[in-house]
Amino acid sequence: MLTADIRRIAPQTPAAPAPDRAPEWVAAGTPEPLRAGLIEALGKDRVLTRALDLVKYASDASPYRLIPRAVAMPHDTDDVVKLVRWASRTRTPLVFRAGGTSLNGQSQTDSVLVDVRQHWQRVRVLDGGARVRAQPGMLLGHVNRLLARYGRKLGPDPASSDIACVGGVIANNSGGMRCGTWADPYSTVSSMTLVLASGAVIDTAAPDAEERFASAAPELANGLERIRDELRADRELSERVASKFKIKNTMGYRLCAFLDADRPLEIFRRLVVGSEGTLAFVAEAVLDTVPFGRHASVALVPFEDIDAAADAVAPLVAAGASATELMVAPTLIAAAHNMPGTPERWKTLRPESAAVLVEFRADDPDSLDAPEQAALEILAGRAVIDEPRFTRDRDEIEMLWHVREGMHGLLAAVRPSGAALIVEDVCVRPERVAEAAKDLQAVLGKHGFLPGLAGHASAGNLHFMLMLDFGKPEDLERYDALIHDLADMIVGKYDGSLKAEHGTGMNMAPFVEREWGPKATELMWQIKQLADPEGILGPGIVLNREPGVHLRNLKSTPEIEEVATKCIECGFCEPVCPSRNVTTTPRQRIAVRREMARQPPDSPVRQALLEQYEYEAIQTCAADGSCAAACPVAIDTGKLVKALRVRQHRAPATRAGALAANHFGALERVARAALRLGGGLAARASRRALPAAAPSQLPFTVREGAAAVYLPACLNRIFGNGRDSAVHPTVPEALVAVSRRAGRPVWIPSDVAGHCCGTPWSSKGYTTGQQLMAGRVASALHRWSDGGRLPVVIDASSCAYGLLDEVGADGIEVLDSIAWVHDHLLDHLEVRHRLGTVVVHPNCSGTHLGLSSKLAAIAARLADEVEIPAATGCCGMAGDRGWLHPELPASALRNVARELDGRSFDACVSSNRTCELALEQVTGRRYSSFVIALEEATRD
């Protein structure tokens, strides 16, 4: 009776089943003999075949949706070799996917999808940061955090850097806001380890690589030499190719490789960049890095019109601007109405005006003075609306870049129900960007679309977005008409690129010949045939002779729960989700939910998804809200999951939750006794190492003269500080001591036992129990604080966040221990025992409270060096969920453990006991509260 009832979480029945719903065969999973063949080739643990597996991989950031028949999960290069050889024998197409942020359908298939993210996350910094060696599943943002200490970064910097993976960036030849053609993957990839369609493995950096390539793939090598000679002999075509690639261009294959390299393998290595996984698999790449100044100065300069804005770009670039981003007035006006913090005056901008976001970067602040002054002189006398003002304030800079990078989320927030977003990008020669922008606005207006544009002005690269409901035939016709007019304008008038940075994909494959002409396109078809004679690598993704393929397999977006219905499936949530390498991500939880909503109530697919959703989506969700911070429209998928947990509880479970709330004081005593008497048994039962019990008595304090009320979290009232409590103080002992030492003593009420923030109930969906506890704690806080006269300090960030989020604590100041120490104690304490290096883990709740920088500042007072691992994120513990599902923290923290491996530190600190326990278990290092480290460092 206490088990979940999955029938209670079935979505609302649609008025009519969606035309693009998953077919009934999906209910049984991967069909035979495909399933058996894949398992034989790779092994059962490397193949996903259930209904939920297929549906969760059907969606990516593009407007397309194809349901794969199976998902392969290779762990290493040997697995990929086995996979491509099996695919070649069976003529089974493969499509590789890393981050799933591609926008044009290039990571979509109805055959076998190959996940090269989950087990492909190794990276190594080389030559003092001058180069990096990375696997395809490594996040760009993670690599850049590792490089930051060297003042370097990867060249490509797409807006999706925090979720885009190295493999996808190379596959699409992605660019970005500060990335010209000189810094894109084509220019910065120095070597690769490739798996050819035959299964041959070639390291292009090996001394004998050319010879091995010629031996392993003689027809390919000879064919590339033939095409090289043919292209070079055709002066008109070779000049056109050279000209086309002077600007950003990701349409088709990079024929410039035949002009830039002489030998077959070097030509092929260059062709693989931007080939979208259709010529070979990149198992590893070495990339050159570029310098990146640690300090920035930014201004958003509004101009009277687009011409004036564009005219200022070249001089600003000559003055050293690292970025010059063009935004037209409709974009800024929409931002002003929908983005908090944007200037009020943007709402009244004239429609014909435009703005340029200008950024300068330098290694030290003084070096920004000269370019700032040069920029002001350049802008003086031009048709600017407001006097230009540069800022170096991090918060202001973040807001300005948020406007530029937040276009995706901005339109998602106002997206009509059922509409999808399509992101387009084109490129023209930079000197014609103003003219092209006006023409593009006219084309958009002609077809009834918002004429909002933004782009990398110095590169002539313009981006725009479309909102369409593909369930409406008129929207499909409108989109098709727009694309054809766009092609006529960009290619016919400007000889530009129909895709500058986003890759070709099924969205633009039908238009490759329109841009390149029959002769160049035929050479591309020859390249594909030479590299992939069996046609197993992403067929139809870059080259496709089927007209209208860009109008097929467009996904519907059925309404689901309000908290998640605005999701555009961009995937920005995925890197911060602790279950991303175990079960599902927030994007996938929502995508599967939408598939349920597409199905009729008696559908076997719906039933299969409901049954599998319980563990895959509900039980293994940490519900910590990290996804909301990363999401462009602030969707907290944890709230969706918690709402589903409430719905699936039967009455006996709800009563049990209320009973626990009413007798929580007794439960505390039982828990401590269990830890003292049966810690070993409990650890074995939970498959986790448990700490010692906390002392039965809390430290002695008095109310008189207290500067704050101290509510020790139930975590710290139950769990002690590990098995070395005799050596180190407990958290309550340490906080009482440092508060007294700083002249700000705290008082612990004698009746704190039995009081809790309520998070254990709300996170599990026990609403009645949470309400009971919330009422009790709110009353106690009011009484203890003398009606709000004294602040209340709590020593676990999740509990502080819970009190503020769940209880509300109206009129009472609730302070996390980080804020208490940083704002009230730190300046009154003397560090007498300084540490060398301290590792800091900012946990989810502290991050939500905006306290991560304060935690780092406290650590900086204690130590010569503070390190926050580049892989830091949610630990996956989520209260007790990590004990119930130890696979969560084990997976969430694996990259942190790798980063710390083999190094020594004086202390590892955080601000939440269960997070510290998870970190200890996975990394093998002792983690404790920062308060303990502070107390020990400030002792006499």
How would you label these PLM feature ranges?
Residues D532, T637-D940:
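Iron-sulfur cluster-binding electron-transfer modules in prokaryotic oxidoreductases
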Residues L543, V549, R580-E616, A634-L659, ...:
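Non-heme iron-sulfur electron-transfer modules
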Residues G535-I541, F572-E595, T620-R647, G802, ...:
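Iron-sulfur cluster-binding cysteine motifs and their immediate structural context
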Residues L38, S62-L94, V112, V116-A159, ...:
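N-terminal glycine-rich flavin-associated loop
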Residues L48-Y57, A257-L265, R269-A481, M489, ...:
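C-terminal substrate-recognition/cap domain of FAD-linked oxidoreductases
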Residues M1-R85, R89, T101-A130, P207, ...:
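N-terminal flexible segment immediately upstream of the FAD-binding catalytic core
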Residues V166-A261, L265-A336, R350-V356, R580-D602, ...:
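Mobile "lid/hinge" segments at catalytic clefts and subdomain interfaces of large enzymes
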Residues V512-R514, V549-E569, P600-A623:
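Ferredoxin-like iron-sulfur electron-transfer modules
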